[in-house]
């Protein structure tokens, strides 16, 4: 991804975006070197004489390349490619890895000038690469609160093989018609040289959209140079080699580029060089440069216009107040539409003059003279400190991040610069799946949070696992107050810390605010009232109390393991044992046991739950709650001992998309052997080797949860949801809604009735799929076996064949089954359906008769212990989440390269910056083999911080690769989550 060229959608409206990807290099179609005066290609012009000399016709038209060559030779030795990461969300910016351009402005001290949107407002880590491919670590030393420039610093001693050149800043040399070159990392190509001519000096700052960084209160320079992503921070140089401007953005629909004048960067550089504080003043007013004709329409008098034109003959307009922020220094004094005439007696016609005056008068009262509706009015306004309304700290807690509201955001929506801003609405503060930032907190647990300090004190008083109400607004809809209840989770994500920017070191210093949260409050017994299902038909009255067997199950999965794509899910489960407190629920809603579970009764009472069992094949989980805490009349339903058959009728009770109870008379249309399709790009758990019930009811497909029952209330099947593949554009996950026969679950239910959780369940580590008799004949099944099948099959006559064989886990023996084997019998019994394989759950091995390549084989097939299938160890390292390959991975791969599987990575971490791919396997660290997570941790915890290490990886497609990764333990410490005696424990490894 390449940050850099932030381009407008067109040259006339204030819409813009950053180009975040490499842009293919295309030969420009408007190169003046190859066009005639009419703009047509010069293919038919005799450009050169027969002696090889340039024709007189074009002698003066071509630029003097010799002088430019000398200039460029010097410039390229000052230009650097910046490889960087914004490691954390902060203010308007999200964590990201990117590249851009900068150039040396002080070779002795190692100062580099680049854009503010490159340095970023938050934590920054990066390095620069010089023209000779030497690199140096850089640290940010200044980022301007408003204008799009910042400074990085490197150690000049790190560059040993090249003389570093520096560019002098000469903003005064930027003139209309000046020929310029933009030298930088255009389109991520490290070095590109783009030509153009300055066409404007007085453009208003481009607008890149709301909730994004925007420059304002400054002129921009315009030129046509066709720069693209990665060119941000490039020097704009004239023929003499002076930097006359700084590349910042451009149009997305034209070749137009926008450059920042370097007046304020020059002043900031001089302050840094002299060890002085860079003062920045502001009155919280956004000005726009408007032409004189528009100023007249807004109330500028002819006399004032004449005076301005006389004083500034080269100017085309004046500054007009576009926005006055509430509660700012100018609030109640200046108004939108006021035309600025002077400040403290100094006539004003440019942003540069305003900056020069305000920056030197912070804290002072200045006299502003404006024209309003044909009248001249003056006000005394105290200049505020711009740094004081620019956040320089943030708080991490409960998986989310917060900072004080910034001037940047407040200006976009014309709101006061105060409040707690959610820059990363994740974890407990995930208020919308679509909007991660832009929220302002007003109350937490009914206590006001006017600023970050007040918010910290409120959060310190809230126990772990408590549910509290919050009041909040979105800055884009400030009229609407939102109130909701959140779950404060601080056991999976225990961090509660303050990060403060340290300009002397360039890093952000962390301070732990609270080592441990207050202990969770103990739940108390509660009662709830159920409302039964009303029926006019007395024959169905036995189903009226089935709602007493349903509970709502809410899941929070804070750690993205096993490639499960969701963090929060809501579904319904069935109480299969009310006396002992057991609930059966789809693994679509409870994917693994690394989550918090809440069981809600009668839409009224909520109790904590715990995952105690995960079926490896049949897509259901068992959740336990404490029945002593539920005083309501929860019912254990009756269970049938007869499997449903095709054509049978049943009564459907389910919960639809609105979580409302619906009912329907249904008929079983099919009972089929099914495997849920795979999500190949992100392998995850899915139901396999299933015998599923399909219905002819449209209503059932609107329900994620439910049951099939007889009219007397006896349960025949559970209606559950199966998570399947991802659609073609990777935006949505396909789900399947099917029935699971009660008889297929009864062995587990009987154990639960004895208050025993099934343990030691065993399975065949292979997938089977149905095959028609016709296909079996073609593949060599003899008539003898076909006749046996025809004698015993009652419904569909189909064989089962091995569809896929899982890769064995470390230390496991591979199954003798092979893809394509057609199963005839198991332990002497003919296999007609998936249900006939159910004997595997309590057998160490099974005797198979299969047809393979038209030959009959007798195989003894071992089963595997499923107690090791569930994830029990997770490692967080350099922004990546590592775990042993879960069962969904092993089902789709032939061989496991190692037990270190990359399941997720942070967008701003070293793992993303240096190319650790998700769904890959780490096999070696510094050429030391690391087969397991334990061996990996043992090696990396001895590697110092800020050190390059070599990793060898193998992709999911078995392609080996070697990369180098630089550790960053300050922002991305190494820690583990490990399941010990049924409980998860966290261990941090400090270097």
UniProtKB/Swiss-Prot annotation:
- EC number(s) reported in the record: 3.4.21.-
In what ranges is there compositional bias, type Acidic residues?
38-50
Positions annotated as active site in the UniProt record? 117 (charge relay system), 148 (charge relay system), 231 (charge relay system)
What domain of life does the native source organism fall in?
Eukaryota
| GO CC annotation | nucleus
Q: Which UniProt keywords apply?
A: Apoptosis, Hydrolase, Nucleus, Protease, Repeat, Serine protease
Q: Which residues form the PDZ domain?
A: 296-374, 885-957
Question: Which biological processes are named by the entry's GO terms?
Answer: apoptotic process; cellular response to heat; lipid metabolic process; stress-induced homeostatically regulated protein degradation pathway
Localization annotation: Nucleus
Q: Read off the InterPro entries from this record.
A: PDZ, PDZ-like_dom, PDZ_6, PDZ_sf, Peptidase_S1_PA, Peptidase_S1C
- Which stretches does the entry tag as region Serine protease? 86-269
Its EC top class is hydrolase
Checking Gene3D superfamilies in the record gives:
2.30.42.10, 2.40.10.120
- GO MF annotation terms: serine-type endopeptidase activity
Which residues lie within the region annotated Disordered? 1-57
Q: What does this protein do?
A: Nuclear serine protease which mediates apoptosis.
- Name this protein carries in UniProt: Pro-apoptotic serine protease NMA111
Q: Which organism is it from?
A: Meyerozyma guilliermondii (strain ATCC 6260 / CBS 566 / DSM 6381 / JCM 1539 / NBRC 10279 / NRRL Y-324) (Yeast)
Q: What is the lineage of its organism?
A: Eukaryota, Fungi, Dikarya, Ascomycota, Saccharomycotina
Q: Which gene encodes it?
A: NMA111
